[in-house]
């Protein structure tokens, strides 16, 4: 019988080249910067860019909106829904 040395999977991963398959550039917040649009509940065209086709608010990890601006955006969308400018659900 021959002795085999067993390498744990984590060590094997680093030994076999643990390069990342691709580099994804971090997106910047669309509401930061000098020419950034203001978040306003009356701007339905801007708010609808951050809604899914079902009418749900798209999470910030997909839209790259900062946490502070995501809260403002959610509040503006909810206010626009209440004022009947945006639908709650899309049928």
Swiss-Prot record:
InterPro entries: Ribosomal_bS18, Ribosomal_bS18_CS, Ribosomal_bS18_sf. One of its GO terms (cellular component) is cytosolic small ribosomal subunit. GO terms for biological process: translation. Gene3D superfamilies: Ribosomal protein S18. Keywords: Ribonucleoprotein, Ribosomal protein, RNA-binding, rRNA-binding. One of its GO terms (molecular function) is small ribosomal subunit rRNA binding. Part of the 30S ribosomal subunit. Forms a tight heterodimer with protein bS6. Binds as a heterodimer with protein bS6 to the central domain of the 16S rRNA, where it helps stabilize the platform of the 30S subunit. Belongs to the bacterial ribosomal protein bS18 family. This is Small ribosomal subunit protein bS18. It comes from Gluconacetobacter diazotrophicus (strain ATCC 49037 / DSM 5601 / CCUG 37298 / CIP 103539 / LMG 7603 / PAl5). The gene is rpsR.
